[in-house]
Regions:
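Active-site environment of divalent metal-dependent phosphoester hydrolases
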Residues: 17, 56, 104-109, 179-181, ...
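Core dinuclear metal-dependent hydrolase active-site scaffold
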Residues: 8, 37-41, 47, 159-189
Length: 219
């Protein structure tokens, strides 16, 4: 069987106040965060972990994010998105067989609608959270325009889920940042195991803290 390949692609870049992640940081400090999408080229098909920001965000952030851009400021240039990243390695949207949504914030599911032929997997608790009435507030972090599409239809999953049935891509519940956030444990033949943790860990150097960051929620 052909070894699985893993490609990291840019889904955008944002700037946020550092206190969102580290409560005791200086309030004047900000941090730049890459939005990472991951393509897994499995023998049974192409699997994409997260789809990043919508292509319209760099030029029209307010019309796309409806106020969310005030605290999650997009800083990537036009054309920096997962679609162009895929195209650069010879993969088009219709070549993707499975899309895994770590969670349904717009910097992680913004391009979902472009993958019309894919099976789209999301944790059942995450879908429930995004559909809740209170999720319509900007502060909740969900935008229906980015995740609620007739195609591809969402496939809710619960617990650990073996995506391809061979143990190479296993979805793991990682609640905290959102109620139904998931990571993916990826096992490569030559390089070993990797955990795609999404926003469960946003930057190196994070440490035990005295206060709960605003980016975490009780789950």
């Amino acid at each position: 069987m052909k070894p699985m390949a893993m490609h990291f692609l840019s889904g955008g870049r944002v700037r946020m106040r550092k206190t969102v992640y580290i409560p005791d940081a200086d309030r004047s400090e900000s941090i730049e965060l890459p939005v990472i999408c991951t393509l897994l080229r499995h023998a049974q098909g192409n699997v994409l972990f997260d789809t990043g920001c919508h292509p319209d965000v760099p030029e029209n952030p307010a019309s796309r994010w409806h106020g969310m851009e005030k605290f999650m400021i997009p800083i990537m240039p036009k054309g920096e998105n997962v679609l162009s990243g895929l195209s650069g390695i010879g993969v088009e949207a219709d070549d993707i067989d499975v899309v895994i949504c770590s969670h349904l914030h717009p910097d992680h599911c913004g391009c979902n609608a472009f993958f019309r032929k894919a099976t789209l997997m999301v944790h059942a608790r995450e879908l429930e959270a995004a559909q809740a009435p209170e999720a319509q507030a900007v502060a909740a972090g969900y935008l229906r325009a980015d995740w609620d599409h007739p195609a591809p239809a969402m496939t809710p999953v619960e617990g650990e889920t073996d995506v391809m049935g061979d143990g190479r891509i296993v979805l793991l519940p990682l609640p905290g940042h959102t109620p139904g956030m998931m990571g993916a444990l990826v096992r490569l033949e030559n390089s070993g195991a990797f955990l795609l943790a999404s926003d469960a860990l946003t930057r190196g150097g994070q440490r035990p803290i005295r206060q709960r960051p605003r980016c975490l929620r009780n789950s």
